[in-house]
Amino acid sequence: MNEPIMNAPWQPPAGELPAFVSSQPTIGILIDRVRKVYPARKSSAEVVALDDISLTVPKGSILGVIGRSGAGKSTLIRLINGLDKPSSGRVIVNGVEITALSERDLRTARRSIGMVFQHFNLLSSRTAFGNVALPLEIAGTPKAEIEKRVLPLLDMVGLADKRDRYPAELSGGQKQRVGIARALATEPSVLLSDEATSALDPETTDQILELLKQINRDLHLTILFITHEMAVVKALADRVAVIEGGRIVEDGATFDVFATPRHEVTRRFVSSVTGSGAPDWLLEKLQPQQPPGGQAVLRITFKGSDANQPLLSRVSRDLGVNLNILSGQVEMIAGHPFGTLIVSLDAAPEVLRQVIAQLSAGNNLVEQLGYVA
């Protein structure tokens, strides 16, 4: 039996390629106007799990799909790996329309799609080596080839010394490393991750995310992961898609989505990890109208190189106002600096307008949140 080659997508038998094979060589995953409806059952009404979803994941990139529970994330990943079929639309992976394959061809095509699960899904009766070897055994790979394939994978995920350990003897992070190695056993070109870090502690989560980034760099894998944690998106994704109620409400480059979230759902996700939201103590004091002796409260979002500029001191000097910093932080997102400051100032309306105009220079975004006494 022919084995798939690293990063080489499965192809139908030689001859003229059928219509369902995409001619886009740079696209790893293409989701085209997909709709998934679960029909009504007895007293339950029909459920529209996905509604007109379209996404493109370039080969070798990492896309994070984030949404709340019930948003449609798990349904989406089941359609990509062919465990379920859409009611309409197309799913194309590695140039092959998954939704048009027979069961036999689908089983073959799945070898180019690796899957990492939330709860590891390891067989307790098998060692780390045995769990990683399982998909190769199912594919009929010769024993000698299995040995040559599995040992480097265990070494890649940092478990070369744990090959004979059973799942009960491994930590949560080690179990997930075994799961990642198993997902890579058939040398896929696409890796799907279903909440792979949600059952892990923060330190272990960081280690697993770094491992996934290393795998993406070293093997040039296309990675699509679903999560409900924006911190995971910030750490791992090149691009992000926000799903809500079965629809993509926002998508784009990770930095752009963090820097300028357009949808309310996205803004809530972003504020949970960037500190861009006002702290609770300030929200309790904010007033919509200026009280006697009150100060205006501004939120300034700095993007890219502007995050490193001494803008506050310059505005304070030019306009003769004192800007009091109430909260703020600067961090790196997708390799770019991103900062948020919340300040208060006592200024007449005309001076306040000038302050906002100067602070809005370049890529900065300035919002007036209200007033505090």
Swiss-Prot record:
Quote the catalytic activity from the record.
L-methionine(out) + ATP + H2O = L-methionine(in) + ADP + phosphate + H(+); D-methionine(out) + ATP + H2O = D-methionine(in) + ADP + phosphate + H(+)
Top-level taxon of the source organism = Bacteria
**How does the UniProt record describe the way this protein sits in the membrane?**
Peripheral membrane protein
The UniProt keywords, alphabetically, are: Amino-acid transport, ATP-binding, Cell inner membrane, Cell membrane, Membrane, Nucleotide-binding, Translocase, Transport
Enzyme's top EC category: translocase
Q: Where's it found, cell-wise?
A: Cell inner membrane
Its cellular-component GO annotations read: plasma membrane
Positions with a binding annotation for ATP: G67, R68, S69, G70, A71, G72, K73, S74
Return the EC number: 7.4.2.11
Q: Which InterPro entries match?
A: AAA+_ATPase, ABC_transporter-like_ATP-bd, ABC_transporter-like_CS, ACT-like_dom_sf, MetN_ABC, MetN_ABC_transporter-like, NIL_domain, P-loop_NTPase
- GO MF: ABC-type D-methionine transporter activity; ATP binding; ATP hydrolysis activity
- All copies of domain ABC transporter, residue ranges: 29-270
Primary localization = membrane
SUPFAM superfamilies, per the entry: ACT-like, P-loop containing nucleoside triphosphate hydrolases
How does it associate, per the subunit comment? The complex is composed of two ATP-binding proteins (MetN), two transmembrane proteins (MetI) and a solute-binding protein (MetQ).
Functional note: Part of the ABC transporter complex MetNIQ involved in methionine import. Responsible for energy coupling to the transport system.
Q: Which family does it belong to?
A: Belongs to the ABC transporter superfamily. Methionine importer (TC 3.A.1.24) family.
Q: What is this protein called?
A: Methionine import ATP-binding protein MetN 1
